[in-house]
Amino acid sequence: MKKLTIIFILLLSTFSCFSQAEFTTCLFDGARNRVIPITVYQPQKVNSKTKVVIINHGYDGNKNRKSNQTYSYLTRFLSQKGFYVISIQHGLPNDPLLAMEGDFMQTRMPNWERGVANIYLTIQEFKKLKPQLDWDKLILIGHSNGGDMTMLFATKYPHLINKAISMDHRRMIIPRTEKPR
Protein backbone atom coordinates (compact mmCIF):
# COMPACT_ATOMS: atom_id res chain seq x y z
CA MET A 1 0.00 0.00 0.00
CA LYS A 2 2.85 2.36 0.85
CA LYS A 3 4.46 1.68 -2.57
CA LEU A 4 1.17 2.41 -4.31
CA THR A 5 0.79 5.70 -2.45
CA ILE A 6 4.33 6.76 -3.37
CA ILE A 7 3.73 5.90 -7.04
CA PHE A 8 0.46 7.84 -6.98
CA ILE A 9 2.17 10.91 -5.48
CA LEU A 10 4.97 10.69 -8.04
CA LEU A 11 2.44 10.49 -10.87
CA LEU A 12 0.57 13.53 -9.54
CA SER A 13 3.77 15.53 -9.23
CA THR A 14 4.65 14.64 -12.83
CA PHE A 15 1.32 15.99 -14.05
CA SER A 16 1.75 19.22 -12.11
CA CYS A 17 5.10 19.80 -13.83
CA PHE A 18 3.27 20.08 -17.14
CA SER A 19 0.22 21.97 -15.92
CA GLN A 20 -0.60 25.30 -17.45
CA ALA A 21 -3.24 27.98 -17.18
CA GLU A 22 -5.76 28.38 -19.97
CA PHE A 23 -8.35 31.15 -20.00
CA THR A 24 -10.51 33.24 -22.30
CA THR A 25 -10.94 36.98 -21.97
CA CYS A 26 -11.60 40.03 -24.15
CA LEU A 27 -9.70 43.15 -25.07
CA PHE A 28 -11.49 46.30 -26.17
CA ASP A 29 -10.34 48.57 -28.96
CA GLY A 30 -11.92 51.93 -28.16
CA ALA A 31 -10.80 53.50 -31.45
CA ARG A 32 -12.75 50.90 -33.43
CA ASN A 33 -15.39 50.19 -30.76
CA ARG A 34 -14.48 46.52 -31.12
CA VAL A 35 -14.30 43.66 -28.66
CA ILE A 36 -11.43 41.24 -29.35
CA PRO A 37 -11.94 37.84 -27.72
CA ILE A 38 -8.72 35.99 -26.96
CA THR A 39 -7.71 32.71 -25.40
CA VAL A 40 -4.47 32.58 -23.45
CA TYR A 41 -2.40 29.45 -22.88
CA GLN A 42 0.11 30.26 -20.16
CA PRO A 43 2.99 27.91 -19.45
CA GLN A 44 3.69 26.79 -15.91
CA LYS A 45 6.79 28.97 -15.60
CA VAL A 46 6.76 32.54 -16.87
CA ASN A 47 9.89 34.69 -16.79
CA SER A 48 11.94 37.10 -18.93
CA LYS A 49 12.94 34.25 -21.27
CA THR A 50 9.35 33.17 -21.98
CA LYS A 51 8.69 33.70 -25.68
CA VAL A 52 5.29 34.80 -26.94
CA VAL A 53 3.34 33.19 -29.79
CA ILE A 54 0.22 34.77 -31.29
CA ILE A 55 -2.07 32.41 -33.24
CA ASN A 56 -4.38 33.67 -36.01
CA HIS A 57 -7.09 31.24 -37.10
CA GLY A 58 -8.51 30.62 -40.57
CA TYR A 59 -11.86 31.86 -41.85
CA ASP A 60 -15.04 30.08 -40.78
CA GLY A 61 -17.82 32.33 -42.06
CA ASN A 62 -18.01 34.25 -38.74
CA LYS A 63 -20.15 31.37 -37.41
CA ASN A 64 -17.93 29.99 -34.69
CA ARG A 65 -17.32 32.27 -31.73
CA LYS A 66 -14.50 29.97 -30.66
CA SER A 67 -12.49 29.72 -33.88
CA ASN A 68 -9.47 30.87 -31.92
CA GLN A 69 -9.68 27.61 -29.95
CA THR A 70 -9.71 25.44 -33.09
CA TYR A 71 -5.96 24.99 -32.86
CA SER A 72 -5.93 24.07 -29.17
CA TYR A 73 -3.83 20.98 -29.94
CA LEU A 74 -1.10 23.34 -31.19
CA THR A 75 -1.58 26.08 -28.60
CA ARG A 76 -1.50 23.62 -25.71
CA PHE A 77 1.57 21.90 -27.14
CA LEU A 78 3.40 25.23 -27.48
CA SER A 79 2.40 26.20 -23.95
CA GLN A 80 3.68 22.89 -22.61
CA LYS A 81 6.97 23.64 -24.37
CA GLY A 82 7.19 26.93 -22.44
CA PHE A 83 5.65 29.47 -24.84
CA TYR A 84 3.09 32.05 -23.71
CA VAL A 85 0.39 31.63 -26.37
CA ILE A 86 -2.33 34.14 -27.26
CA SER A 87 -4.98 33.07 -29.76
CA ILE A 88 -7.08 35.88 -31.23
CA GLN A 89 -10.73 35.48 -32.29
CA HIS A 90 -10.78 37.55 -35.48
CA GLY A 91 -14.21 36.86 -36.97
CA LEU A 92 -17.18 38.19 -35.03
CA PRO A 93 -20.85 37.49 -35.89
CA ASN A 94 -21.52 41.06 -37.07
CA ASP A 95 -18.42 41.31 -39.29
CA PRO A 96 -18.92 41.42 -43.06
CA LEU A 97 -18.39 38.02 -44.66
CA LEU A 98 -15.08 37.39 -46.39
CA ALA A 99 -15.17 38.00 -50.16
CA MET A 100 -15.10 34.78 -52.17
CA GLU A 101 -14.62 36.35 -55.59
CA GLY A 102 -12.86 39.22 -57.28
CA ASP A 103 -9.31 40.41 -56.76
CA PHE A 104 -8.67 39.15 -53.23
CA MET A 105 -5.87 41.65 -52.68
CA GLN A 106 -8.60 44.29 -52.88
CA THR A 107 -11.78 42.54 -51.77
CA ARG A 108 -10.28 40.86 -48.69
CA MET A 109 -8.00 43.70 -47.64
CA PRO A 110 -10.55 45.19 -45.16
CA ASN A 111 -10.72 41.82 -43.37
CA TRP A 112 -6.94 41.49 -43.29
CA GLU A 113 -6.53 45.09 -42.07
CA ARG A 114 -9.02 44.39 -39.27
CA GLY A 115 -6.95 41.34 -38.34
CA VAL A 116 -3.73 43.37 -38.36
CA ALA A 117 -5.38 45.94 -36.06
CA ASN A 118 -6.47 43.10 -33.73
CA ILE A 119 -2.93 41.71 -33.62
CA TYR A 120 -1.40 45.15 -33.05
CA LEU A 121 -3.77 45.98 -30.17
CA THR A 122 -3.21 42.55 -28.61
CA ILE A 123 0.55 43.06 -28.66
CA GLN A 124 0.32 46.57 -27.20
CA GLU A 125 -2.07 45.54 -24.42
CA PHE A 126 -0.18 42.40 -23.46
CA LYS A 127 3.13 44.25 -23.39
CA LYS A 128 1.55 46.36 -20.64
CA LEU A 129 -0.05 43.38 -18.87
CA LYS A 130 2.93 41.03 -19.18
CA PRO A 131 6.08 43.17 -19.56
CA GLN A 132 8.21 40.38 -18.11
CA LEU A 133 7.75 38.23 -21.25
CA ASP A 134 10.35 38.14 -24.05
CA TRP A 135 8.65 40.46 -26.54
CA ASP A 136 11.83 40.71 -28.65
CA LYS A 137 11.29 37.18 -29.93
CA LEU A 138 7.57 37.42 -30.72
CA ILE A 139 6.30 34.74 -33.13
CA LEU A 140 3.14 35.10 -35.24
CA ILE A 141 1.49 31.97 -36.61
CA GLY A 142 -1.48 32.02 -38.96
CA HIS A 143 -3.50 29.49 -40.90
CA SER A 144 -5.18 30.29 -44.24
CA ASN A 145 -6.91 33.67 -43.78
CA GLY A 146 -5.01 34.04 -40.50
CA GLY A 147 -1.82 33.38 -42.47
CA ASP A 148 -2.73 36.27 -44.77
CA MET A 149 -3.17 38.50 -41.71
CA THR A 150 0.16 37.27 -40.33
CA MET A 151 2.01 38.09 -43.56
CA LEU A 152 0.38 41.52 -43.84
CA PHE A 153 1.31 42.26 -40.21
CA ALA A 154 4.89 41.13 -40.89
CA THR A 155 5.00 43.50 -43.88
CA LYS A 156 3.61 46.49 -41.96
CA TYR A 157 5.32 45.95 -38.59
CA PRO A 158 8.50 43.91 -39.15
CA HIS A 159 10.17 45.54 -36.13
CA LEU A 160 7.54 44.10 -33.75
CA ILE A 161 8.02 40.42 -34.54
CA ASN A 162 10.89 37.98 -34.80
CA LYS A 163 9.23 35.21 -36.83
CA ALA A 164 6.15 34.95 -39.01
CA ILE A 165 4.85 31.46 -39.77
CA SER A 166 2.07 30.87 -42.26
CA MET A 167 0.28 27.57 -42.64
CA ASP A 168 -1.41 27.44 -46.04
CA HIS A 169 -1.95 31.11 -46.78
CA ARG A 170 -2.38 31.70 -50.51
CA ARG A 171 -2.99 35.34 -51.19
CA MET A 172 -0.82 37.68 -49.18
CA ILE A 173 2.74 38.17 -50.35
CA ILE A 174 5.44 36.91 -48.00
CA PRO A 175 7.65 39.82 -46.94
CA ARG A 176 11.14 39.61 -48.41
CA THR A 177 12.98 41.13 -45.50
CA GLU A 178 15.71 40.10 -43.12
CA LYS A 179 13.31 40.49 -40.21
CA PRO A 180 10.97 38.81 -39.50
CA ARG A 181 12.11 35.38 -40.64
Describe each PLM feature range.
Residues 4-13:
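Sec-dependent N-terminal signal peptides
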Residues 17-49, 159:
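A domain-start/cap signature at the N-terminus of enzymes
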Residues 22, 85-87, 164:
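Conserved beta-strand scaffold positions in the cores of enzyme catalytic domains, especially
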Residues 32, 47-48, 78-80, 133, ...:
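Extracellular/periplasmic catalytic domains that process cell-envelope and extracellular macromolecules
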Residues 34-129:
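Serine-hydrolase catalytic machinery in alpha/beta-hydrolase-like enzymes
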Residues 121-178:
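Primarily recognizes the serine-hydrolase "nucleophile elbow" in alpha/beta-hydrolase
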Residues 181:
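Short beta-strand/loop motif that positions the catalytic acidic residue
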